[in-house]
Amino acid sequence: MLIRTSIKTINQKLKDNPSWNTLDIGCGYHEFKGKINNLIGIDPYNDAADICVPLLDYHPEERYDAMLALGSINFGSTDKIFAELEHAVSLCNPGAVMFFRANPGLPHDKDESNWISFYPWDANFVVNCADQLGVDILDIRTDSHKNRLYFVWRTK
């Protein structure tokens, strides 16, 4: 299954670079805390985060070598999504690796999540954003189980 492969890839890349500072955007319950060195998790709604703040309001002094956004940049208009991507890129050092999982606009399986509207991600949008933001695309693929879009960027 692709998600397991993606998580293994992320874990291996971060284990191979233990000195990297890593940002987990929308970390939720912060499940990677203690598993990834030098990890900072931000989330506007979950107290398990290191810092409870929306992405666009996060302005740290340091920059990051790796970034995770595994389902957190999924809500709002095209302009909001692009602004969040642009801000995420600005938080990274040159050569940083950015791992994303995006919902292509599909509803969640759980009834309590039916009210959530997801941005309709597709590969063309990812490519266009990468071009506009000046990042390299290292990988892009779709999960065959839940149709999530996975992509990896590298900053220049």
PLM region descriptions:
Residues 75-87:
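A short, conserved alpha-helix within the catalytic core of class I
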Residues 76-77, 92-94:
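Helix-to-beta-strand junctions that scaffold the AdoMet/dcAdoMet cofactor pocket
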Residues 68:
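A conserved beta-strand element that flanks and buttresses the S-adenosyl-L-methionine
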Residues 1-59, 87, 97-156:
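Class I (Rossmann-like) S-adenosyl-L-methionine-dependent methyltransferase catalytic domain
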Residues 72:
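Hydrophobic adenine-recognition pocket in adenosine-nucleotide-binding enzymes
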